Swiss-Prot record:
SS bond list: C37-C40, C102-C129
Segments traversing the membrane: 11-27, 46-62, 69-86, 144-162
InterPro entries, sorted: DiS_bond_form_DsbB/BdbC (IPR003752), Disulphide_bond_form_DsbB (IPR022920), DsbB (IPR050183), DsbB-like_sf (IPR023380)
Protein name: Disulfide bond formation protein B
Amino acid sequence: MPAWLTNRTIYFLCFLAIAGLMGFAFYLQYVKDLEPCPLCMAQRIAFVLAGLVFLAAALHNPKNTGTTVYAFLGWVTTLGGAALATRQLWLQSLPADQVPACGPGLEYMLEAFPFSEVLTMMLTGTGECAEVQWTFLGLSIPGWTLVAFIGFTAVWAFAWVRRPR
């Protein structure tokens, strides 16, 4: 392993990768006019939280116990995001007659419903979450986000195993 490839460098590179993923998400939304569904928005939140944990770890450069704490927080955010992506992939695999009904837009939900109901609707997904709007190499957007979340989870495992003792 090169000497320059410290945990701090890895954390910062992961933060930059997540910033790039968020930039690509906004590109798909605002340039390609792909409207994100509630589960997509929840996955974005998970990416932002994971990115903030990576940034905090890069700035703090934790040692033994600190690395364990950051790894735990990182695992919570990345595994939570992976669960959301898996849920959306499951919705996309349903036959058309089993897809849940489409719900209102997120802005309307935030204005009209209590936050607990909005959160439930975001995490369970609606009919628009089952729509495949874009693919690359045979994987839809939630497929690629699942790959990214698994990769970031592995980075936290690597950092935890490699932590200074």
